[in-house]
Amino acid sequence: MFHITVLAVGRLKEKYLTEGAAEYLKRLSAYAKISVVEVEDGSLPENPAAAGGEKVKEKEGERLLGRLRPGTFLIALDVRGKMHSSEEMAEILNRLALSGRSDITFAIGGALGLSEKVLERAAMRLSFSRMTFPHQLVRLILLEQLYRWFKIARGEPYHY
């Protein structure tokens, strides 16, 4: 059985996000041991594009890296990552399982994204789109996609 960790900067605040995440976590429990680990997000400077923004991203990255389990297969969610279809991701998860890689961590950065150190540590960089999404919404999208990938892999109805 997979052990999947969603490692995220910040807490979900909006009710619709917390309710949606709770629903998909409940659904996913039939397919994997899944946990969500949140690390504190940094205070954004007035001008995040300035050097202060990089420092916030580095601090958040240190917090994320400090929560990684040894040997986990790290997938970084990054707008510059590679895009895959849901079917392709289901196949990637199958290949990881067949190769003995059942401990997988998905890292979601804060408002400024992931630090270079986190991106360098990642075995894979995944993008859901070339568009930018709020990092809290990305968590809900990831949980839905994880559920979809497991349904596809098992040939169960959900994905059409």
From Swiss-Prot:
Belongs to the RNA methyltransferase RlmH family. GO terms for cellular component: cytoplasm. It is found in: Cytoplasm. Transmembrane segments: none annotated. GO terms for molecular function: rRNA (pseudouridine-N3-)-methyltransferase activity. Keywords: Cytoplasm, Methyltransferase, rRNA processing, S-adenosyl-L-methionine, Transferase. The lineage of its organism: Bacteria, Bacillati, Bacillota, Clostridia, Eubacteriales. This is Ribosomal RNA large subunit methyltransferase H.
